[in-house]
Structure formats: C-alpha cells, structure tokens
C-alpha cells in the first residue's frame, strides 16, 4: 500500500484527465488486497461517482445529503474531522461550494484534495456575465463533461492506491458505459419534443449544460447561484414566453 504520495503527484491527476478510457473491460473487478481507500466527498454527485469507481476498494462518505444547497453549505466540526481522516478528499470546485472555497484551497496544501469538476477543460465550460472570472459549475448536467470529473476521480484513487488500478479502471469503464447509454436514450426521447417547445424554465439556473447537450433553451428564474433573487417582472415575462411558445408543464 503506497499512500505516502506527494501533493504534487496528486495534482498531476488533472493534467492527465483527457486521456482516453481503456476499451477492453475484464469480466469482473479485481479483488482488493489492501485496505479500502477512505474517501470523503462534498456532494452526492461526487460521492456517487466515487462509490461507483471505488466499489469494494473504497469507503465513501458524502457530507451533503439530499436537498442540501451546496452553494450555501458550510463545513461543520464533524465534517472537518471526517475530512482530516480521509485518504482522499473530493469536492466539486468551480465555486459550487462557494462558502467552502477558501477552506478547501487551504486544506489542499498538505492533503490529498481534488476539485473534480475543475478537470473539465475551460473551453468546455460556460462563463456567466453575472460572475466575472467564474464558470457555471453544474457540469454533471451534461454526461460528456461529467466524464472528465469521473476520470479525474479514478486517477486520483489510482495515485493513492496503485494496487487497485485494474479494479478502479474496470469499475470506471462500466460506470461511464451506463452513463453513455442513459444519455443516448435521453437524446432519443427529448428529440421528439417539437423544436419550438424545447424551452426549459427552472427556479435555479442550473441546467445550461443540459440545454447544450440535448438542444433545449434554458431560462432560470434565479441565476446560477441560489443566492440571487427573482423579480416579479421576470416571472411575468417568463409566463408570457411559455404561453407564446406553447410549452407544456
């Protein structure tokens, strides 16, 4: 078991996330012979990906449960304890966990920390006029962008425990194959919606990557952060737009 890796080596994970996935997949994952990797993740999306990638070779704890707003969440003492005990800390990045941004940047100085979403190339990220210098963080809404985060998590786990490499790669390939299958099905179904009705109105403007992936115009009542507010004039204008375009609920 080799977990005395330098922080520099883990950060190199991000540099290699654009490499292609292996095509051949063994019939069964390798059996773990070392202690499972202890992973603490912030969001459910990151935690779910880590569980699928790690399988029996990882123990994953997610700090945020269902319904928790990652934009407003702040770390608790219990969270800090779990993060301190982890072999690998996974957070989303791209300012999704806005209140914890500074904490994680400092925490990464002497620990294995990965901002998984920041593995996505910047030319594939959506900039936002309301937040200068920052990108829309909701990349999990597009499977093709989410792939970069998944591969980054896989590579970080392999760097921490190379002995699990075969199993981690196999689990990752299976996970990505399932995502691709669901995405293909979604494209087929959503293509049946008439073009003029492909308008998605949401309370929180978190679906822009979804819109790009599946050909929908997306309008949010709030901005990309839940901290923004919506005025009555905007809501009235959106109602008029829905009526004009004959968009069904």
Give the positions of each predicted feature.
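Extracytoplasmic metal-acquisition and chelation regions
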Residues: 2-7, 11-18, 25, 29-249
């Amino acid at each position: 078991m080799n977990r005395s890796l330098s922080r520099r080596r883990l950060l190199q994970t991000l540099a290699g996330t654009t490499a292609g996935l292996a095509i051949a997949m063994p019939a069964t994952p390798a059996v773990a012979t070392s202690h499972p990797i202890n992973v603490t993740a912030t969001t459910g999306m990151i935690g779910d990906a880590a569980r699928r990638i790690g399988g029996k070779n990882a123990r994953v704890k997610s700090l945020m449960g269902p319904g928790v707003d990652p934009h407003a969440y702040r770390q608790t003492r219990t969270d800090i304890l779990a993060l301190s005990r982890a072999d690998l800390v996974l957070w989303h990045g791209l300012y999704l966990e806005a209140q914890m941004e500074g904490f994680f940047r400092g925490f990464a100085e002497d620990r294995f920390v990965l901002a998984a979403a920041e593995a996505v190339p910047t030319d594939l990220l959506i900039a936002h006029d309301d937040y200068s210098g920052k990108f829309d963080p909701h990349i999990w809404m597009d499977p093709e962008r989410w792939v970069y985060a998944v591969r980054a998590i896989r590579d970080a786990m392999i760097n921490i425990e190379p002995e699990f490499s075969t199993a981690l790669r196999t689990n990752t390939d299976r996970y990505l194959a399932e995502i691709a299958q669901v995405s293909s099905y979604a494209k087929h179904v959503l293509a049946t919606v008439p073009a003029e009705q492909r308008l998605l109105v949401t309370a929180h403007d978190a679906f822009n990557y979804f819109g790009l992936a599946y050909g929908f115009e997306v309008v949010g009542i709030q901005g990309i952060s839940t901290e923004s507010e919506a005025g009555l004039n905007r809501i009235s204008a959106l109602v008029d737009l829905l009526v004009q375009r004959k968009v069904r609920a």
